[in-house]
């Protein structure tokens, strides 16, 4: 992680699945390690997700607090070249993970199950999670930031695909099993005017699926690094979205 930040020198970093084991502070440790390499970054205490800024932080906020491992969202504000920026990190609920149901696995237990009978059945599972609750809270806060002249960026692990990626043209690829699914979180973001940065640059999910999960590890068998070893579970569930009124 440190080497990648040193290599890229990003203005902001969003972390997902942060764990402050043994009463430690993960982002403070990262900042200290970067300081040893001559880079100054700022942060604040978080749990489950985390944020770093190369620019002084003017405010921080817990938008969706972590409770019982259902994810979290935090926000910082800063400025870059005189432009006000609000950056959010999001790790959304991993349970009721309905894109597994669409592939014949239960999205909470990851045991094999019969395929759903309909898209409605998939969506019923999907909205049982807290992902949509969290993203609605994000949108509400982001609208306040936008009204105050901030550019808004959200990055993180949504644990849910994009409705732009489960379409008619690829419904028989990647074990979509014929389903065209209007996934909730990305639909809500798009309706609120947010731009999916990757899909903006690469609008065709057939030529650029943009898979972010699972990652490959030649040292491990598929059963050790996947939740659904008998299915093609490749998907894009990690995103950077943005919105500006300027």
Task: Give the predicted meaning of each segment.
Residues 1-3, 53-246:
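Active-site regions of metal-assisted phosphoester/phosphodiester hydrolases
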Residues 11, 40, 195:
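Short acidic/polar active-site loop segments enriched in Thr and Asp
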Residues 38-50:
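A short, structured active-site edge motif that brings together acidic residues
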Residues 36-41, 56-59:
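Short small/polar-residue motifs
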Residues 10, 47, 71-73:
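Extracytoplasmic
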Residues 16-19, 45-46, 201-203:
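Short, solvent-exposed turn/loop segments enriched in Gly/Ser/Thr/Pro and often Arg
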Residues 1-37, 235:
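N-terminal, active-site-proximal structural segment of metallo-dependent hydrolase catalytic domains
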Residues 18-24, 47-51, 157-161:
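Acidic helix-start/capping segments at beta-turn-to-alpha-helix junctions
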């Amino acid at each position: 992680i440190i080497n990648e930040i040193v290599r890229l020198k990003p203005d902001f970093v969003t972390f997902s699945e942060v764990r402050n084991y043994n009463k430690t502070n993960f982002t403070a440790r990262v900042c200290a390690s970067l300081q040893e390499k001559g880079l100054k970054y700022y942060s604040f205490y978080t749990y489950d997700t985390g944020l770093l800024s190369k620019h002084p932080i003017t405010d921080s906020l817990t938008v969706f607090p972590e409770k019982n491992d259902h994810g979290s969202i935090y926000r910082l504000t800063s400025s870059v070249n005189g432009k006000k920026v609000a950056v959010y990190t999001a790790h959304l609920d991993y349970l009721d993970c309905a894109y597994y149901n669409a592939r014949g696995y239960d999205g909470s237990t990851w045991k094999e199950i019969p395929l759903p009978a309909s898209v409605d059945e998939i969506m019923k599972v999907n909205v049982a999670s807290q992902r949509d609750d969290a993203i609605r809270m994000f949108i509400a806060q982001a609208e306040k930031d936008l009204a105050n002249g901030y550019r808004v960026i959200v990055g993180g692990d949504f644990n849910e695909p994009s409705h732009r990626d489960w379409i008619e043209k690829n419904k028989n690829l990647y074990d979509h099993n014929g389903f065209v699914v209007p996934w909730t979180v990305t639909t809500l973001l798009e309706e609120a005017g947010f731009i999916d940065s990757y899909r903006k640059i690469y609008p065709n999910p057939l030529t650029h699926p943009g898979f972010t999960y699972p990652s490959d590890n030649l040292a491990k068998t598929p059963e050790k690094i996947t939740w659904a070893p008998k299915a093609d579970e490749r998907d894009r569930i990690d995103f950077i979205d943005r919105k500006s009124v300027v």
